[in-house]
């Protein structure tokens, strides 16, 4: 339980600031970098990448570090969200699921930071997005092998991860 406290603090911290900052979303997922074996022409059932849960743990550790920076006033919540996104792209690459979830995560942080939504509304916004991916996941044709950012947030929110 203790390992979830700091990521939960990060989620809360990223959603409760009231300064105004509106970043532009410049990154567009054109070519996902971690595709499934089926996409690459291999047969067999779907499996997450062997390093997936290690990557989820690394993202959690980075989120914890960024949460501390936000609590010290060194970063805004939106800046922390952007740093976390750069970290996850560097760590696991891009994929449609993580890119989509990050877009909602950033929008939620921006809206919360400028006072348009509450921390609770921000959390619900992210949870609804995650629930949507849980519903789509079983029927997806091209599942990414390493949706680490999405599963990190699933873990933080106490939801069943994508498998």
Task: Please give the residue ranges for each predicted region.
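Sec-dependent bacterial lipoprotein signal peptides
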Residues: 1-18
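Non-catalytic interaction surface on structured domains
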Residues: 4, 21-23, 111
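Intrinsically disordered, low-complexity segments enriched in glycine/proline and serine/threonine
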Residues: 5-9, 30, 82, 124
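Bacterial Sec signal peptide processing site at the extreme N-terminus
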Residues: 15-37
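Post-signal-peptide N-terminal segment of Sec-exported extracytoplasmic proteins
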Residues: 24, 36-77, 81
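Mature extracellular/secreted ectodomains of secretory-pathway proteins
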Residues: 60, 64-153
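Short, solvent-exposed mixed-charge patches
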Residues: 160-163
């Amino acid at each position: 339980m203790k390992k979830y406290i700091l990521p939960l603090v990060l989620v809360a911290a990223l959603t409760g600031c009231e300064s105004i900052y509106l970043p532009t979303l410049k990154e567009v997922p054109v070519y996902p970098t971690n595709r499934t074996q089926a996409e690459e022409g291999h047969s067999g059932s779907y499996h997450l990448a062997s390093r997936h849960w290690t990557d989820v743990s690394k993202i959690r550790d980075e989120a914890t570090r960024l949460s501390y920076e936000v609590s010290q006033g060194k970063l805004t919540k939106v800046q922390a969200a952007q740093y976390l996104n750069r970290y996850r792209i560097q760590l696991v690459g891009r994929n449609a699921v993580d890119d989509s979830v990050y877009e909602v995560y950033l929008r939620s942080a921006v809206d919360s930071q400028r006072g348009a939504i509450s921390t609770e509304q921000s959390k619900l916004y992210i949870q609804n997005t995650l629930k949507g991916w849980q519903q789509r996941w079983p029927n997806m044709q091209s599942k990414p092998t390493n949706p680490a950012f999405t599963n990190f947030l699933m873990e933080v929110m106490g939801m069943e991860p994508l498998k």
